[in-house]
């Protein structure tokens, strides 16, 4: 891209990652902004086409023109983000929060589903029923949609009294130190630059060798094999 940089151009990043960790050399006489959709790429396209839109973070990394923020907001409007709301922040906010989801929150979610599948099938429950209850029915997707609309706990009004009591009682029980430590380790790996160093090496030195191995391992777990069997039966 560097040969195409000219004075006065606007350079936009859809993520703050490479800006936070200084992995790119910015053109000195140009506006550099971030319009970062809070949505997966496929969802960005589908929600743009449908007219629904999606939220986004917006920030300015470099303001050569004095109008960089206005340009960034206009870009957010053009891609459909203003229909759901644009939050102005700084580059590091987007990077840290995005990576915390990827390094901290989602791995815990995957662990919970995988362990629940293992335990429930060991207790003799049919694997197809376990998967359907967990997420194949898309009830969980509806739950999270309602959490986004109503609030994490306010969506509980849609559940039966039994479900409300069970969830709230267990939410207040147990020792959260393991979860806290897991999340804190993730945050420290971001703040120290340890994760970026590891990821840069994975891309340049190892040519994604470890990523390929991790994907292969995940796709050969018992839960993935059970998913394949259930999908074949549902066709």
Label each PLM-derived region with a short phrase:
Residues 3, 114, 118, 181-188:
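A broad, structural surface signal
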Residues 12-100:
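Rossmann-fold dinucleotide-binding core
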Residues 63, 107, 176-177:
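Residue-level marker of alpha-helix boundaries and capping positions
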Residues 125-235:
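NAD(P)-dependent Rossmann-like dehydrogenase/reductase catalytic/cofactor-binding core
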């Amino acid at each position: 891209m560097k040969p195409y940089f000219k004075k006065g151009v606007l350079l936009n990043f859809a993520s703050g990652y490479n800006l936070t960790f200084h992995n790119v050399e910015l053109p000195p006489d140009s506006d550099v902004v971030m319009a970062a959709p809070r949505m997966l790429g496929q969802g960005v396209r589908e929600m743009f086409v449908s007219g629904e839109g999606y939220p986004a973070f917006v920030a300015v990394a470099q303001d050569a023109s004095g109008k960089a923020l206005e340009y960034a907001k206009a870009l957010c409007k053009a891609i459909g983000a203003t229909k759901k709301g644009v939050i102005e922040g700084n580059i590091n906010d987007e990077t840290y929060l995005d990576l915390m989801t990827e390094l901290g929150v989602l791995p815990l979610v995957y662990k919970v589903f995988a362990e629940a599948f293992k335990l429930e099938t060991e207790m003799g429950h049919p694997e197809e029923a376990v998967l359907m209850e967990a997420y194949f029915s898309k009830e969980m997707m509806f739950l999270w949609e309602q959490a986004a609309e109503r609030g994490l706990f306010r969506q509980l009004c849609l559940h039966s009294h039994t479900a409300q009591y069970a969830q709230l009682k267990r939410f207040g029980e147990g020792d959260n130190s393991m979860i806290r430590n897991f999340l804190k380790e993730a945050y420290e790996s971001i703040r120290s630059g340890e994760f970026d160093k590891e990821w840069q090496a994975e891309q340049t030195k190892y040519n994604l060798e470890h990523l390929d191995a991790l994907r292969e391992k995940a796709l050969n777990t018992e839960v993935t094999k059970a998913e394949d069997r259930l999908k074949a039966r549902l066709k």
